[in-house]
């Protein structure tokens, strides 16, 4: 059976912008998540069209109906959503279920929700959160599970090389990937 291949990089966006990226990142997925206001279907349509044109995989956060309506490649379940449990049998075979977690308890919840990949964050120090995992704790959390893990949180030019020693499938970002094309990832490019 053909398994849906996930991108190595993910970019989180909350609205459509004409030039979302200042670079051409190969093997990229875009996750639309907008928690501040009602989801704008016009923005979703424009993002989906942009992704189709650029051959970028497109995912929608927290709304299965919209993900199916706009034929996204999958759904992203944020760490705060503890209710959704999806049955892969009811979805198309290439539909991916991905989620995010901050600790072991949330990782287990995402696995129970059917997530094949998990964004684990924050890896490094970020402005909005004083707590972060760090390299050792991050690796200890990921080694216990067979799921694919993505590094998220605080990734910058100064610490990008550290990703090479992590037990990860790829990385995700909000601002770093918009501005930079990661050049120093070795096995990830």
Language-model features: locations:
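Glycine-rich phosphate-binding active-site loops on the catalytic face of alpha/beta enzymes
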Residues: 75-86, 119-131, 155-189
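Short, acidic/polar
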Residues: 11-24, 62-65, 102-109, 156-161
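N-terminal active-site wall of soluble small-molecule enzyme domains
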Residues: 18-19, 29-90
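Hydrophobic faces of well-ordered beta-strands that scaffold small-molecule active sites
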Residues: 7-13, 28-32, 58-60, 75-77, ...
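Conserved, mostly hydrophobic/aromatic
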Residues: 30, 67, 110, 118, ...
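Alpha-helix-loop-beta-strand connector modules within alpha/beta enzyme cores
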Residues: 43-59, 82, 87-103, 131-156, ...
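N-terminal amphipathic alpha-helix/helix-capping segment at the start of soluble metabolic enzymes
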Residues: 1-19, 189
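Internal catalytic-core helix/loop-beta-alpha segment
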Residues: 94-124
């Amino acid at each position: 059976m053909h398994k849906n291949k996930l991108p190595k990089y993910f970019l989180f966006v909350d609205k459509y912008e004409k030039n979302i990226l200042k670079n051409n990142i190969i093997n990229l997925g875009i996750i639309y998540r907008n928690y501040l206001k009602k989801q704008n279907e016009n923005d979703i349509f424009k993002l989906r069209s942009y992704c189709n044109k650029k051959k970028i995989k497109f995912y929608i956060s927290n709304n299965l109906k919209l993900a199916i309506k706009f034929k996204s490649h999958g759904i992203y379940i944020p760490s705060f959503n503890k209710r959704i449990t999806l049955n892969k049998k009811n979805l198309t075979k290439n539909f991916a279920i991905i989620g995010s977690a901050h600790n072991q308890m949330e990782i287990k919840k995402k696995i129970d929700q059917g997530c094949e990949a998990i964004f684990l964050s924050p890896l490094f120090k970020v402005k909005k959160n004083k707590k972060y995992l760090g390299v050792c704790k991050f690796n200890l959390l990921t080694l216990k599970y067979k799921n694919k893990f993505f590094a998220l949180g605080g990734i910058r030019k100064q610490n990008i090389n550290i990703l090479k020693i992590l037990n990860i499938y790829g990385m995700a970002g909000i601002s770093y990937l918009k501005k930079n094309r990661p050049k120093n990832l070795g096995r990830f490019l």
